[in-house]
């Protein structure tokens, strides 16, 4: 393609290139005045020009950046909408009432400090309750109005008024309607045979009136006392007393675990609630009935007794009934002797829980003669298919074998009061209607694991502060800065405990949840296995009537007290750690001040003997430690003269050596800076020190006492070089020389008694160390540099030589003792060898006597 551009004038004065192109290169909707191929859809077909390309690239980048900005805006709006939607869903879910949750509730404990032998406790909820420590409460909603005294059992455990939820027990057999008729039990013959008679007007037998009840078309008939049932209409329809009258509430426990509405349970001993029976004020009474399984009437008083031959005895009675089919369940009769039990409102009927090794029985007892003898009968609705949960667990027995009376008198109080509960056993689903609290609740510190972490960090901070304070002995001006920094570190550590606690709380709640899940699944599996083994006589959708007594080998998943021990131990550690932290924080400033005072050195001297037992391994606080200390003190006292003499020699020698060194250094420095006359004077001085009086110098050298620079001979006779100085005259001494020679001597000798200040050499021997705001470390450093005398560091030298002498003396005593032992052994061996030698010599002489001349007789 060939393009030729013609530039021509256009009317109006505008010069525009005119382009001629081939047919293939022509673009749509172009004009003759446009130098570019123009397209409305794509405006990027430019002329062949470098500047045009750059402009095109810039436009593309700007469009992309604008597009990105638009994309970020869209993403932000999308996230905002997503967050709003999520928050709305969460808000809706938080406020959504969750009905009929099955919570993990422990059954089978007691009220703290009372004879109430059964109660419920929150065991495994997430995460508002803590097992065995943070107990929840329950309450009833029945008002009691009497003119008597207070209801002390309720008032003793008053905590707070909370929300109320109605319990659900309509699924239980104990809340079903029964068809009952009144009967009389007549025992006229002496064979303990009791006849059942249908009558209209009933009389008491064994202290109670009786009913025959069934709900299975005579397949199963139950003979029960009339006190356990309540008639609801005129058609002989009865229900167990207390059904649908108990209101209960689980406090502060989000029941958010759902294992099914109807789990299979083997045997449940329910908690007891005080409820007021409906009736007039004169007949109102307090009954005990659980929220999930109603055991009928547990009357005003409840005693707990140990089942034995002395307390209660079984009466063997034969119940005879005419013409019946199916199962006829008769009660068990007891004659009991109870002491210290008083009924409420002076009524004759009391309720007694009798526990034995393998089972628990609920008795209704009647006392007609105001004595200690009671006629008792086992409650039919107090036993679930003869399967029981033993009341006192083997490791959690009731404190007292029997309990005294309950003060059950009532005044104008209400039962809207909560009770504090104690540890319980077992896990039982409790169906309630509640609003699920699905959020985490900030509760009290659980285990205090964060306190352990904070203790480690705080201990590190305290150790660091102690180290920095010790270093600050030589830097007094930095102590306040170090102290402030240490306080900042410790405050940050203590403030960080809350953040760590939040993490620990979530972890702890997860552990509790997992533990509760595992326990429930294990118990459920064991229950199902037990059902498969023993079978069921009668089974509903909730309960299985087995016909077997409770066995101690069943349901022992929660017998271990390891969890309780862990919780109590962690609580103790938590309190101890917090106490230690506060004590360390309060004493930190005082410890810093102590480190910065000379008292620390004095305290080290006081504590020196207390550390000797630690220096010698294995001594401890035994008597050997005191023996060793006595020997060390004895050796130190006996060796003190020699030690002092040796130390005096060492220090005096070091002082003389230092004085000689300083003297030579002093004169050498001044002689190098003065004129020839000063050099000559220095040579004369050296000649007087080293050359003159050779014999006396040798005497000083080999003298027994070390030369200290001030011997009597030196002071008595002036040296020849002194006279030589005087002969020259003072006219040759310059003012500068006078100042340099006389001034040091005067300044040094002004501390020496009896000195005139005219002998600079004598003063140089007694140079006094002056500390200018330094300490022993600066002194030693200056001594190493040669600017101070060595005696500055004499104390470590004394200590070293003293320890060497003590160790040497101990070693000498040891070696001498060893030599004495060897000498005694050698003497003993020599004595033994001498005795053996003499014995052998004696025996040898006896066996080999000396030759004797024997004359034979001669015959003539």
Swiss-Prot record:
Q: Give the residue spans that cross the bilayer.
A: 615-635
Role description: The surface protein (SU) attaches the virus to the host cell by binding to its receptor. This interaction triggers the refolding of the transmembrane protein (TM) and is thought to activate its fusogenic potential by unmasking its fusion peptide. Fusion occurs at the host cell plasma membrane.
What protein name is recorded for this chain? Answer: Envelope glycoprotein
Quick one: which gene encodes this?
env
Recorded GO molecular functions are: structural molecule activity
Gene Ontology cellular-component terms listed? host cell plasma membrane; membrane; viral envelope; virion membrane
Task: List glycan-bearing residues.
Answer: 40, 112, 141, 148, 186, 201, 214, 235, 244, 308, 337, 340, 346, 369, 400, 407, 412, 423, 484, 491, 551, 558
**Keyword set, alphabetical order:** Cleavage on pair of basic residues, Coiled coil, Disulfide bond, Glycoprotein, Host cell membrane, Host membrane, Host-virus interaction, Membrane, Transmembrane, Transmembrane helix, Viral attachment to host cell, Viral envelope protein, Virion, Virus entry into host cell
Under InterPro entries, the record lists: GP41-like, Gp90_EIAV
- Enumerate the residue ranges of region (Immunosuppression): 499-514
* Assembly notes: The mature envelope protein (Env) consists of a trimer of SU-TM heterodimers attached by noncovalent interactions or by a labile interchain disulfide bond.
Give the taxonomic lineage as stored in the record: Viruses, Riboviria, Pararnavirae, Artverviricota, Revtraviricetes
Q: Where is this site: Cleavage?
A: 445-446, 685-686
- Which Pfam family name is an example for this entry? EIAV_GP90
Respond yes or no to whether keyword Glycoprotein is given for this record.
Answer: yes
Q: Which residues form a coiled coil?
A: 577-625, 664-700
Q: Which domain of life is it from?
A: Viruses
Output one GO BP term: symbiont entry into host cell
Show which residues sit on the Extracellular side of the membrane.
Answer: 7-614
Q: PTMs?
A: Specific enzymatic cleavages in vivo yield mature proteins. Envelope glycoproteins are synthesized as an inactive precursor that is N-glycosylated and processed likely by host cell furin or by a furin-like protease in the Golgi to yield the mature SU and TM proteins. The cleavage site between SU and TM requires the minimal sequence [KR]-X-[KR]-R.
Annotated region Disordered: the residues are 746-765
Annotated region Fusion peptide: where?
Answer: 447-467
Q: Which residues lie on this side of the membrane: Cytoplasmic?
A: 636-860
Proregion residues are 1-6
